[in-house]
Amino acid sequence: MKVLQEKILNEGKVLSGDVLKVDAFLNHQIDPVLMQEIGKEFAKRFKEENITKIVTIESSGIAPAVMAALELGVKVIFARKRKSLTLQDNMYVANVYSFTKQETNEISLSRNHIDESDRVLIIDDFLANGQAALGLMSLVEQAGASIAGIGIVIEKAFQDGGKKLREQGIRVESLAEIASLDNNAVTFVQQETAEVK
């Protein structure tokens, strides 16, 4: 997705060979026009899949998930990382290791909002080692729902998460695939190296 790649090049910051900071438009400050385009792109790619629900994880997956849901005319349910007083019982639970935060989180979805009749599209902001996607898949599978695919805003293709998911037969659609973050530069899969400002 060219507009997303341009945003990454212009506003993203490479912090190391495996960390890309995109808080200027995706996971702290949100660019709503970009999110709308991302939502349209996910909807276009998954329009034939009869999606009934989108599942994501708080908090950075919510904006792209909501925009895709708006385009597809379905609801979004987001997995919580923290316990809530209003959501104590009747939860599906999975453990997810966060590469960025270097910690394991228990994530949960209410059983009241997803069941075996749902055909789910999972959406998240990043795909690196695949732990968040696997955790979300576990929650969807616990509900007995089917997984139509996974939509990723930015995939770090140099890490093995995408490969692992695709080897399991999961359809993964990534809007920007990064081959490398070496030398303070973003290299997109099948693209030339571009220096990040």
From Swiss-Prot:
Positions bound to 5-phospho-alpha-D-ribose 1-diphosphate: 128-132
Q: Which InterPro entries match?
A: PRibTrfase_dom (IPR000836), PRTase-like (IPR029057), Pur/Pyrimidine_PRTase (IPR050118), Xanthine_PRibTrfase (IPR010079)
State the UniProt keywords alphabetically: Cytoplasm, Glycosyltransferase, Purine salvage, Transferase
Q: Which residues cross the membrane?
A: none
Reaction catalysis annotation: XMP + diphosphate = xanthine + 5-phospho-alpha-D-ribose 1-diphosphate
- Per the UniProt record, which EC number(s) apply here? 2.4.2.22
Recorded hits in Pfam families, A to Z, give: Pribosyltran
Q: Does the keyword Transferase apply?
A: yes
Q: Which domain of life is it from?
A: Bacteria
Q: What does this protein do?
A: Converts the preformed base xanthine, a product of nucleic acid breakdown, to xanthosine 5'-monophosphate (XMP), so it can be reused for RNA or DNA synthesis.
Q: Which PANTHER family match?
A: HYPOXANTHINE/GUANINE PHOSPHORIBOSYLTRANSFERASE, XANTHINE PHOSPHORIBOSYLTRANSFERASE
What is this protein identified as?
Xanthine phosphoribosyltransferase
